[in-house]
């Protein structure tokens, strides 16, 4: 996986400059995950995010469909250059729930993560072209971990890395939530997350089995 976007392909740079201005773009590494590498592009007229990965067509299509349904980034450009896909997006407000600057206690993080997910899974997904429509399936995020959920003023404000979203088993997102809370805060907060979501009570062994369903 590439750790630097430089040099930016000409078409990518031109698209970014059309939005940010031609007075120089400053590239800043943002994060890296299994889904790709992301940079923050800063210019005189604002900020864009640039993701680079082998295949981002699915994520681009999902961002278009989810726009207006979930608080996802708006697409600013999509390119295939140098053997990879390059996805330009506008920023969404808020900070990731994994960010210490949020200042929340783990209990509040866990309960908010569960409450947000309950709302997301209640989204009307009629006509969703991704995943499988069958009884019990809902519109899932697909990688519902703390870094991918943004909040502002105590409310859900953004969702990123939606390349696996679509109709699916709600346990997919529940497993990711249990895993991310255990990874960042240790055991003990998964139950609060599940309670806030409204999931039936589970034994410790069942929660651990659910956690193990998450794999990235």
Which functions belong to the PLM regions below?
Residues 143, 148:
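Conserved catalytic-loop position in the HRD/HxD motif
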Residues 138-140, 152-202:
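Active-site Asp-x-Gly
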Residues 19-42:
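ATP-binding glycine-rich phosphate-binding loop
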Residues 35-36, 47-87, 99-119:
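A conserved alpha-helical element in kinase catalytic cores
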Residues 40-44, 90-91, 152:
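Active-site beta-strand termini and strand-to-loop segments that position acidic
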Residues 1-25:
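Juxta-kinase regulatory segment immediately upstream of eukaryotic protein kinase catalytic domains
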